[in-house]
Amino acid sequence: MTEQAEDTMPIRFTDAAAAKVKTLLEEEQNDALKLRVYVTGGGCSGFQYGFTFDEKVNEGDFTVEKQGVQLVVDPMSLQYLVGGEVDYTSGLEGSRFFVKNPNATTTCGCGASFSV
Protein backbone atom coordinates (compact mmCIF):
# COMPACT_ATOMS: atom_id res chain seq x y z
CA MET A 1 0.00 0.00 0.00
CA THR A 2 1.23 3.48 -0.73
CA GLU A 3 1.18 6.20 1.90
CA GLN A 4 -2.06 8.18 1.88
CA ALA A 5 -3.43 10.93 4.08
CA GLU A 6 -5.80 9.48 6.67
CA ASP A 7 -8.81 11.38 5.30
CA THR A 8 -8.32 9.83 1.83
CA MET A 9 -8.07 6.24 3.10
CA PRO A 10 -10.88 3.91 2.02
CA ILE A 11 -11.18 2.78 5.65
CA ARG A 12 -9.97 4.41 8.85
CA PHE A 13 -8.33 2.75 11.87
CA THR A 14 -8.95 4.76 15.05
CA ASP A 15 -6.38 5.48 17.72
CA ALA A 16 -8.48 3.51 20.24
CA ALA A 17 -8.54 0.42 17.99
CA ALA A 18 -4.83 0.65 17.21
CA ALA A 19 -3.96 1.05 20.90
CA LYS A 20 -6.00 -2.04 21.82
CA VAL A 21 -4.39 -4.09 19.04
CA LYS A 22 -0.97 -2.96 20.25
CA THR A 23 -1.82 -4.06 23.82
CA LEU A 24 -3.09 -7.45 22.63
CA LEU A 25 0.02 -8.03 20.50
CA GLU A 26 2.24 -7.24 23.47
CA GLU A 27 0.28 -9.79 25.54
CA GLU A 28 0.68 -12.40 22.78
CA GLN A 29 4.34 -11.49 22.31
CA ASN A 30 3.90 -11.74 18.54
CA ASP A 31 4.57 -8.52 16.63
CA ALA A 32 3.82 -10.27 13.33
CA LEU A 33 0.07 -10.36 14.05
CA LYS A 34 -2.25 -7.91 12.31
CA LEU A 35 -5.94 -7.19 12.92
CA ARG A 36 -7.97 -8.46 9.96
CA VAL A 37 -11.52 -7.20 9.48
CA TYR A 38 -13.76 -9.00 7.00
CA VAL A 39 -17.35 -9.19 5.82
CA THR A 40 -19.23 -12.47 5.39
CA GLY A 41 -22.78 -13.39 4.54
CA GLY A 42 -24.97 -14.06 7.55
CA GLY A 43 -26.40 -12.45 10.63
CA CYS A 44 -29.91 -11.12 10.91
CA SER A 45 -29.33 -8.31 8.38
CA GLY A 46 -27.56 -10.17 5.55
CA PHE A 47 -23.87 -9.43 6.14
CA GLN A 48 -21.77 -9.59 9.27
CA TYR A 49 -18.41 -8.25 10.37
CA GLY A 50 -15.62 -10.48 11.57
CA PHE A 51 -12.33 -9.75 13.28
CA THR A 52 -9.34 -12.05 13.59
CA PHE A 53 -5.61 -11.81 14.07
CA ASP A 54 -3.52 -12.89 11.10
CA GLU A 55 0.23 -13.07 10.53
CA LYS A 56 0.09 -12.63 6.78
CA VAL A 57 -1.03 -10.06 4.26
CA ASN A 58 -2.39 -11.65 1.09
CA GLU A 59 -1.97 -10.25 -2.40
CA GLY A 60 -4.57 -7.55 -2.98
CA ASP A 61 -5.18 -6.91 0.74
CA PHE A 62 -5.47 -3.29 1.83
CA THR A 63 -3.50 -2.31 4.94
CA VAL A 64 -3.57 0.67 7.27
CA GLU A 65 -0.79 1.19 9.78
CA LYS A 66 -1.21 3.18 12.97
CA GLN A 67 0.87 3.20 16.16
CA GLY A 68 3.08 0.47 14.68
CA VAL A 69 0.24 -2.04 14.16
CA GLN A 70 -1.66 -2.96 11.00
CA LEU A 71 -5.30 -3.31 10.03
CA VAL A 72 -5.79 -5.65 7.04
CA VAL A 73 -8.86 -5.87 4.77
CA ASP A 74 -9.33 -8.23 1.84
CA PRO A 75 -10.53 -6.68 -1.45
CA MET A 76 -13.98 -8.33 -1.36
CA SER A 77 -14.69 -7.00 2.14
CA LEU A 78 -13.24 -3.56 1.39
CA GLN A 79 -15.97 -2.83 -1.15
CA TYR A 80 -18.53 -2.99 1.69
CA LEU A 81 -16.38 -0.98 4.10
CA VAL A 82 -15.26 2.00 1.97
CA GLY A 83 -15.64 5.19 3.98
CA GLY A 84 -15.95 3.23 7.22
CA GLU A 85 -14.00 3.21 10.43
CA VAL A 86 -12.72 0.38 12.62
CA ASP A 87 -12.95 1.42 16.26
CA TYR A 88 -12.77 -0.08 19.74
CA THR A 89 -14.97 0.53 22.76
CA SER A 90 -14.96 -0.60 26.35
CA GLY A 91 -17.94 0.00 28.60
CA LEU A 92 -20.67 -1.53 30.71
CA GLU A 93 -21.77 -3.76 27.83
CA GLY A 94 -18.26 -5.15 27.42
CA SER A 95 -15.31 -4.46 25.16
CA ARG A 96 -15.25 -4.94 21.40
CA PHE A 97 -13.93 -3.87 18.06
CA PHE A 98 -16.66 -2.50 15.80
CA VAL A 99 -17.18 -0.92 12.39
CA LYS A 100 -18.84 2.43 11.75
CA ASN A 101 -20.09 1.80 8.22
CA PRO A 102 -21.73 4.59 6.19
CA ASN A 103 -22.72 2.04 3.52
CA ALA A 104 -24.97 0.06 5.88
CA THR A 105 -28.62 0.86 5.24
CA THR A 106 -29.80 -1.21 8.22
CA THR A 107 -28.03 -2.84 11.13
CA CYS A 108 -29.16 -5.33 13.73
CA GLY A 109 -29.60 -4.30 17.35
CA CYS A 110 -26.15 -5.47 18.40
CA GLY A 111 -24.44 -3.86 15.38
CA ALA A 112 -22.75 -7.10 14.32
CA SER A 113 -24.66 -7.47 11.05
CA PHE A 114 -25.84 -5.07 8.36
CA SER A 115 -27.36 -4.75 4.90
CA VAL A 116 -26.43 -2.48 2.01
Swiss-Prot record:
Belongs to the HesB/IscA family. HAMAP family: Fe_S_insert_ErpA. Gene3D superfamilies: HesB-like domain. Required for insertion of 4Fe-4S clusters for at least IspG. Homodimer. InterPro entries: FeS_biogenesis, FeS_cluster_insertion, FeS_cluster_insertion_CS, FeS_cluster_insertion_RrpA, HesB-like_dom_sf. Iron-sulfur cluster binds at C44, C108, C110. Binds 1 iron-sulfur cluster per subunit. It comes from Shewanella loihica (strain ATCC BAA-1088 / PV-4). It comes from the Bacteria. One of its GO terms (biological process) is iron-sulfur cluster assembly. This is Iron-sulfur cluster insertion protein ErpA. One of its GO terms (cellular component) is cytosol. The gene is erpA. NCBIfam families: iron-sulfur cluster assembly accessory protein, PRK13623.1. Its cofactor is iron-sulfur cluster. GO terms for molecular function: 2 iron, 2 sulfur cluster binding; 4 iron, 4 sulfur cluster binding; iron ion binding. PANTHER family: IRON-SULFUR CLUSTER ASSEMBLY 2 HOMOLOG, MITOCHONDRIAL. Keywords: Iron, Iron-sulfur, Metal-binding. SUPFAM superfamilies: HesB-like domain.
